[in-house]
Curated annotation (Swiss-Prot):
Reactions that this protein is recorded to catalyse: tRNA(Val) + L-valine + ATP = L-valyl-tRNA(Val) + AMP + diphosphate
Gene: valS
GO cellular component entries: cytosol
EC number annotated for this UniProt entry: 6.1.1.9
Pfam families according to UniProt: Anticodon_1, tRNA-synt_1, Val_tRNA-synt_C
Its job: Catalyzes the attachment of valine to tRNA(Val). As ValRS can inadvertently accommodate and process structurally similar amino acids such as threonine, to avoid such errors, it has a 'posttransfer' editing activity that hydrolyzes mischarged Thr-tRNA(Val) in a tRNA-dependent manner.
Name of this chain's protein: Valine--tRNA ligase
Example GO molecular function: aminoacyl-tRNA deacylase activity
One of the GO BP terms on file: valyl-tRNA aminoacylation
Organism (species): Treponema denticola (strain ATCC 35405 / DSM 14222 / CIP 103919 / JCM 8153 / KCTC 15104)
Length: 909
């Protein structure tokens, strides 16, 4: 049944603040975020959100993560897949505990003043307070997560999963405890894993020190002189107090005579052996190194090979302990370094210091220098788990987008080290291990115990440490769905479908999730892994608090709206994990596009009064439509196919660029403008037909755009007439849960596409020619058009009014021969046509011709110079690749300009 339309008013200006919050509440109220099982739905699509730290504040990197997930989730939901996106937060052991400890410090207290139980209560208070901040931020971003399934890594169910995994790995012999060298953060007071150590370039010194040979031993130097000391270079002179040997290469003839002898350790005055080990580089420095097994990972390995004593000289807070001479006890490593150098200098045992810049291992949380430190910790044997993860990748069970990350993944898996999982914190999953003081047994249990199962003693104590935060995060894809219980959600939605994350946590999190999932479910946790680049500032720097160059997503949303921010991030996110540069100005791209969608929709809806929707194309046939209509349906069809293909392979930027190009360039600039002729000159039937097609294409365009501009498209969609879909059929009630556009073969019309592309070329050429000639845009001139027979440009004869209107002309006529070229005109040549702009007295054609000739000569000279440069073997051999590429681009641009100028001059002949 036909529907008489009323004018539909949208607000004059696009104002996202007016509707974004309201639209989000509307989606929540209508349960749009829950999995929807449509008819004939067989596929599921599941994503778990990378859980942000519960006490953190979301930054633009999080915004990128959530945006890309939101786009792909909305797309699959509209495709008809039963779609679930699980939100949640991470308890973030070190980070969260640090927040609370800082607050206590400001009050002159520490956690031990409160006691464990009271301290943890405090942390829960802070967690609850910060959690609401994060969820508010996520809602502001418009993420379509299922809030009913929100998880937290310390939830009861997830805690049960952690216990199950720990005990199971222990029972399989894959978890063990021992005294090992670990990465110790003196500020956080805990061990951290290798992957949590970041390396920063810092200024330092290379200190050259003498060690005297003991018991009268001598060494002959290169000059043939007998000497009694050996020169050693080190960046950590304070650790010499923990040396238990010095080492030389076994095949170094310079030191063969002293292997097995001893030296006197400076300042400590104890004897240590000279050992031979192939770890030593004969060519580096003097070819002698100090060995401190307790404070260097390489020395630790050397020490194990030679059964050297392990002498720990540090306290947990990073100060020197009682194992060193009294004067150095209690000093920080920096103060001890200074004191040691001064004392060596006084003894004549210090040669010199070289200023250097070197990579220093730092805590990823507080950036304190990490100390290699021997302590009793819990570890996971990773190699057996890594092998399964490698095999799964080789079989294609997990696929990386882009593929280049597969090599990184394989390298890490092949070179994996055991994972230190214990942390000297109070906040987190407490290690499920108890020690019996009476019988000395260690008990590992899935449930809390109150007595020793071996001797029934009540004198038991639980391990004080908690598990590394990542120990709960690596279970995230299946623990969030109810594992180890056999839940309906686990059966329906696991394995999950895709993981979207940055390349900075491939090993921290991605690889570990694959290992855990294969070990405990027998399946890979997800099929697809999209690794995106990192967001950097316009100078290419990583965004950080210290640089003050970060972007707060909420500030961007306040200024531009969530759609604008998210569209910009999607548009700029390359498919090859390239880092990209951004600032607040960048979001204007998304803002302008959202504005364009709003204004185009406002124009269409505001000019429909009195029109009747007619069932054009209901039978699937578009033959009765005008060429302009058939062309836009062809372009819409091609856009839907391209966007689907791009999103199916995580080429986000290509998808965003395609919807931008289709809506702005094809729909707004050409189609909407072209339909104005029908409304201006057509009869009532023609106007109804034009309105019906225009509305149908707008309705489908909003569905195409929705994953990228969720709020504004939903707001506009809600205003559309009820029967505005193609064929005057009813539209969906809610855009978010409607069907995504798909390719329809009956819409393919290559002939219309080719013919209309030629019309566009004619219009663009006329516009460009006007601009080149400096003609006032308001001045309407005439054009004479010559069309080659049987060329696509013949479409111009049937669409002369469109060309005339879009080119800003006062008239358009056709000539049958180039001999009929009008006087006082300038021509421009295209594929199958030549257009002559009749300028009359508006410009001096002779002067313009001279200008073009002069510019042509200059461009030919420039092109020739670059051509010679690129043919110069020395230049190509020595110039940086980016310089060569830049020259090639300039050369191509000169050639394009030359071609255009020749065309203009040809048209002036």
């Amino acid at each position: 049944m036909s529907e008489k339309l009323q004018a539909i008013e949208l607000e004059k200006s696009y104002n996202p603040k007016e509707f974004e919050e309201r639209i989000y509440s509307f989606w929540e109220a209508n349960k749009c975020f829950s999995p929807i099982k449509k008819k004939n739905t067989k596929n599921t699509f599941t994503v778990v959100i990378p859980p942000p730290n519960v006490t953190g504040v979301l930054h633009v990197g999080h915004a990128l993560d959530e945006t890309l997930q939101d786009v792909i989730v909305r797309y699959h939901r509209m495709k008809g897949d039963e779609t679930l996106w699980i939100p949640g937060t991470d308890h973030a052991g070190i980070a969260t505990q640090s927040v609370v400890e800082k607050k206590l410090k400001a009050e002159g207290k520490n956690r031990r003043d409160l006691g464990r139980e009271a301290f943890i209560e405090k942390v829960w208070e802070v967690k609850n307070e910060h959690h609401s901040i994060i969820t508010k931020q996520l809602r502001k971003m418009g993420v379509s997560v299922d809030w009913d399934r929100e998880r937290f890594t310390l939830d009861e169910g997830l805690s049960q999963a952690v216990r199950e995994v720990f005990v199971s790995l222990y029972e399989q012999g894959l978890i063990y405890q021992g005294n090992y060298l670990v990465n110790w953060c003196p500020s956080c007071g805990t061990a951290i894993s290798d992957d949590e150590v970041e390396h920063e370039d810092r200024k330092g010194g290379m200190y050259h020190i003498y060690y005297k040979l003991a018991d009268g031993a001598v060494l002959q130097n290169e000059a043939g002189e007998k000497i009694q000391e050996i020169e050693i270079a080190t960046t950590r002179p304070e650790t010499l107090l923990g040396d238990t040997a010095i080492a030389v290469h076994p095949e170094d003839p310079r030191y063969a005579s002293i292997i097995g002898k001893e030296v006197i350790l400076p300042l400590a005055n104890r004897k240590i052996p000279v050992i031979a080990d192939s770890y030593v580089d004969k060519e580096f420095g003097t070819g002698v190194v100090k060995i401190t097994p307790a404070h260097d990972p390489n020395d630790w390995e050397v020490g194990k090979r030679h059964n050297l004593p392990v002498l720990n000289i540090l306290n947990p807070d990073g100060t020197l302990n009682d194992a060193v001479p009294e004067k150095y006890r209690g000093l920080s490593t920096e103060k001890a370094r200074k004191a040691v150098i001064e004392d060596l200098e006084e003894l004549g045992l210090f040669k010199n210091e070289e200023k250097i810049k070197h990579a220093v291992g730092c805590c990823y949380r507080c950036h304190t220098s990490i100390e290699p430190y021997v302590s009793k910790q819990w570890f996971v044997k990773m190699q057996p788990l890594a092998q399964k993860a490698l095999d799964a990748w080789k079989k294609g069970d997990v696929v990386f987008y882009p593929q280049k990350w597969e090599n990184t993944y394989a390298h890490w898996m092949n070179n994996i080290r055991d994972w230190c999982i214990s942390r000297q914190l109070w906040w987190g999953h407490r290690i499920p291990v108890w020690y019996c003081a009476d019988c000395g047994k260690t008990i590992v249990s899935r449930t809390d115990i109150t007595e020793c199962p071996h001797c029934k003693s009540k004198n038991i104590k639980q391990d004080e440490d908690v598990l590394d935060t990542w120990f709960s995060s690596w279970l995230w894809p299946f623990s969030t769905l109810g594992w180890p219980e056999k839940t309906e959600d686990l059966a329906r939605f696991f394995p999950t479908s895709a993981l979207v994350t940055g390349h900075d946590i491939i090993f921290f999190w991605v690889a570990r999730m694959i290992m855990a999932s294969l070990q405990f479910t027998g399946k890979a946790p997800f099929k697809d892994i999209f690794i995106h680049g990192l967001v950097r500032d316009k100078q290419g720097r990583k965004m950080s608090k210290s640089l003050g160059n970060g972007i707060d997503p909420l500030v961007a949303i306040e200024e531009f709206g969530a759609d604008a921010m998210k569209f910009t991030l999607t548009f700029m996110c390359g498919s090859q994990s390239q880092d990209f540069l951004i600032d607040m100005e960048s979001f204007k791209l998304g803002s302008k596009f959202a504005n364009k969608v709003w204004n185009a929709s406002r124009y269409i809806l505001g000019n429909l009064a009195g029109r009747t929707i007619v069932p054009v194309g209901r039978d699937g046939s578009l033959n009765s439509l005008k060429e302009l209509d058939r062309w836009i349906y062809h372009e819409l069809n091609e856009a839907a196919q391209t966007v689907r293909s791009s999103l199916d392979s995580y080429r986000y930027n290509e998808a965003a660029q395609k919807v931008y190009e289709f809506f702005w360039n094809n729909f707004c600039d050409w189609y909407v403008e072209g339909t104005k002729l029908s409304f201006k000159y057509g009869d009532e039937k023609e106007k109804d037909r034009a309105a019906s097609v225009l509305l149908a294409v707008l309705e489908e365009s909003l569905r195409l755009l929705h994953p990228f501009l969720a709020f504004v498209t939903e707001e506009i969609y809600s205003k559309l007439p009820g029967n505005c879909a193609e064929g005057a059929l009813p539209r969906a009630k809610i855009l978010m849960t409607s069907d995504y556009p798909e390719e329809k073969k009956e819409r393919i019309d290559e002939a219309a596409s080719i013919r209309f592309r030629t019309l566009q070329e004619i219009v663009r050429n006329i516009r460009a020619l006007r601009a080149e000639c400096g003609i006032d845009p308001q001045l309407k001139l005439k054009v004479s058009l010559y069309i080659e027979k049987n060329s696509p440009a013949e479409a111009a004869r049937e669409n002369s009014e469109i060309i005339e209107m879009l080119s800003g002309l006062s008239g358009l006529d056709f000539i049958d021969s180039l001999k009929e070229k009008p006087a006082s005109s300038i021509g421009v040549v295209g594929a199958g046509f030549e257009a002559f702009l009749i300028t009359g007295d508006s410009i001096d054609i002779d002067q313009l011709k001279k200008r073009f000739e002069k510019e042509l000569e200059k461009n030919e000279q420039n092109a020739s110079k670059i051509d010679s440069k690129l043919k110069n073997e020395n230049f190509v051999k020595n110039a940086p690749p980016e310089v060569i590429e830049g020259e090639k681009e300039k050369h191509a641009e000169f050639l394009r300009r030359i071609e255009k100028l020749k065309g203009y001059l040809e048209g002036m002949r």
